Amino acid sequence: MAPARAFVLVLLAVASASTAAANTATTTPTNPVAAPTQWQKAHATFYGGADASGTMGGACGYGNLYSQGYGTRNAALSTALFNDGASCGQCYKIACDRKRAPQWCKPGVTVTITATNFCPPNWNLPSDNGGWCNPPRPHFDMAQPAWEKIGVYSAGIIPVIYQRVPCVKKGGLRFTINGHDYFQLVLVTNVAAAGSIKSMEVMGSNTADWMPMARNWGAQWHSLAYLTGQGLSFRVTNTDDQTLVFTNVVPPGWKFGQTFASKLQFK
């Protein structure tokens, strides 16, 4: 897994009228917010140790899951669910399937996790004996504390039922700026509702138009424009086709490595 990165969290003041106005522009969603999906069958294993420290980093690019607010309720998704990183940030409610393995299930409990990593295939092992994340299997390799909420430790792997659910977050979206001149790499975290981002655009305070950003990997988006020193605005569309505009959420004079918090959130 990628090493965890330390980020400086810079909270923007929201008391002034100008800042309040800067973070209230929205675009009417073309689709309603998605309801929880139907329950589906899968399997789940665990990794990362009892404190989930081994889950830090990962293919979604969140880095330190503790400091980013994802904690120990996270999981790596198999190819069938990961969608080349487009599923990063999505939330799933998972229960052990007592109909298939009552002896390994803790009754009457569910756990909700966030997709933060990718569980790669292991083509050296059969899909039903070690190659748990091989396509086309839907599989969750969960942080151990989350897995132990629903399964008996000695089982190692359990059948589960799962449904995708809206993510619940406190506060607004956060934007971490990394990279260098002519390459801004923006990590978007703390995304509620759909949890995952479909598209993203950026506008500098000295530019006239929105410029599309590209998914670099996981929840990281990049722009190749020269925007150093400019205030930055973002137009973000989630996978439920809701759009929010974060006007001047990053002030002029920002530095690479800083994180900027907005008060806007998907609902």
Curated annotation (Swiss-Prot):
Extent of the signal sequence: 1-21
Cellular localization per UniProt: Secreted, Cell wall; Membrane
Keyword presence, rRNA-binding: no
Family matches, as Pfam families: DPBB_1 (PF03330), Expansin_C (PF01357)
An annotated GO BP: plant-type cell wall loosening
Domain Expansin-like CBD: 182-262
Keyword annotations of the record: Cell wall, Cell wall biogenesis/degradation, Membrane, Secreted, Signal
Domain of life: Eukaryota
InterPro entries according to UniProt: Expan_Lol_pI, Expansin, Expansin/allergen_DPBB_dom, Expansin_CBD, Expansin_CBD_sf, RlpA-like_DPBB, RlpA-like_sf
Membrane topology: Peripheral membrane protein
Domain Expansin-like EG45: from-to ranges: 57-172
UniProt similarity note: Belongs to the expansin family. Expansin A subfamily.
Protein name: Expansin-A23
Gene source species: Oryza sativa subsp. japonica
